[in-house]
C-alpha cells in the first residue's frame, strides 16, 4: 500500500486574473467624466452677467443701509451734545449759588467772630488750668506706679530666687536617688519631701553596714561547707586506701 497523494495544484493568481479578462466596473468611469456635457461659451457669458446684476443689487441695498445708519448716528450725537451742554449749564448755576452762599456766610461770621473771640479766650484759660491739673495728677500717679512696680519687681526677684533654690535642692535629691537606684536597685526610693539629705546618707550607710555583715556571714557559711566537704573527701580517701592494702 502506497501513501495517499495529498498534493494540491498551485494556481498562479496573476495568470488566473489574465485568463479571466478585465473586470466589469460599477459606476461612471474616467471616460464618462471626460465625455460629460459641457456648456457653450454663450451660456457661460449669461451666467457671468447674472452674477454681476446680483452683486449690483446687493451693493445698492448696502448703500441704503449705510445712509440710514449715518442719519441715526447724527441724531444720537446731537442728543448727546445737547445733554452735555445742559449739564454744563447746571454746573455753572450751582457754582454761582455756592459763591453767593459763601459770601453771605462770611459776612455773618465776621460779626460773630468778635463775640466768639472773647469766649474762646476764656475757654482757653479754663482748658489751660485743666491741663495743668491733669499733668500734676498724672505725674503723681506715675510716681506711685513706679514705686509699686519697683516693689513688685523686688518681690518677684525674691520669689524667683526661692524657687531656684528649691528646684536646685530637688535636683540634688533626685540625683542622689538616681545614684542610689543604680548602686542599690533593690532598695525603695526615698521621697524628697519626707527625708532630707542627711537622713538619706545615714540610711545609705546603715544599709551598707548590713550588706557587709550579710556578705561576711555568707562567706563564713561557704567556708564551713568547704571544710565539711574536705573532711568527707579525706575520709573517703582513707577508706579507699585501707581497702586497697587489705586486698594486697
Swiss-Prot record:
Compositionally biased intervals (Basic and acidic residues): 68-80, 147-156, 163-175, 211-220
Protein name: Protein FAM133A
PANTHER family listed in its UniProt record: PROTEIN FAM133, PROTEIN FAM133A
Compositionally biased tracts (Basic residues): 90-102, 127-138, 221-248
Compositional bias ranges of the Low complexity kind: 103-118
Region (Disordered) residue spans: 68-248
Native species: Homo sapiens
Lineage top rank: taxon: Eukaryota
Family annotation (InterPro entries): Fam133
Stated family: Belongs to the FAM133 family.
Amino acid at each position: 500500500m502506497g501513501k495517499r497523494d495529498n498534493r494540491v495544484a498551485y494556481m498562479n493568481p496573476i495568470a488566473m486574473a489574465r485568463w479571466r479578462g478585465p473586470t466589469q466596473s460599477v459606476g461612471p468611469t474616467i471616460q464618462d467624466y471626460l465625455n460629460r456635457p459641457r456648456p457653450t461659451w454663450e451660456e457661460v457669458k449669461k451666467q457671468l452677467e447674472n452674477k454681476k446684476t446680483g452683486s449690483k443689487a446687493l451693493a445698492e441695498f448696502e448703500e441704503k443701509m449705510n445712509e440710514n445708519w449715518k442719519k441715526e448716528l447724527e441724531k444720537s450725537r446731537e442728543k448727546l451734545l445737547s445733554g452735555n451742554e445742559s449739564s454744563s449749564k447746571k454746573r455753572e448755576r450751582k457754582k454761582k449759588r455756592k459763591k453767593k452762599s459763601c459770601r453771605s456766610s462770611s459776612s455773618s461770621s465776621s460779626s460773630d467772630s468778635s463775640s466768639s473771640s472773647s469766649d474762646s479766650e476764656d475757654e482757653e484759660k479754663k482748658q489751660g488750668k485743666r491741663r495743668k491739673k491733669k499733668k500734676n495728677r498724672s505725674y503723681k500717679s506715675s510716681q506711685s506706679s513706679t514705686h509699686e512696680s519697683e516693689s513688685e519687681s523686688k518681690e518677684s526677684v525674691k520669689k524667683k530666687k526661692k524657687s531656684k533654690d528649691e528646684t536646685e535642692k530637688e535636683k540634688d535629691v533626685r540625683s542622689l536617688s538616681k545614684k542610689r537606684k543604680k548602686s542599690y536597685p533593690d532598695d525603695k526610693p526615698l521621697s524628697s519631701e519626707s527625708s532630707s539629705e542627711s537622713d538619706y546618707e545615714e540610711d545609705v550607710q546603715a544599709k551598707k553596714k548590713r550588706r557587709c555583715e550579710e556578705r561576711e556571714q555568707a562567706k563564713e557559711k561557704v567556708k564551713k561547707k568547704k571544710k565539711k566537704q574536705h573532711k568527707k573527701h579525706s575520709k573517703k580517701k582513707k577508706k579507699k586506701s585501707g581497702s586497697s592494702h587489705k586486698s594486697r
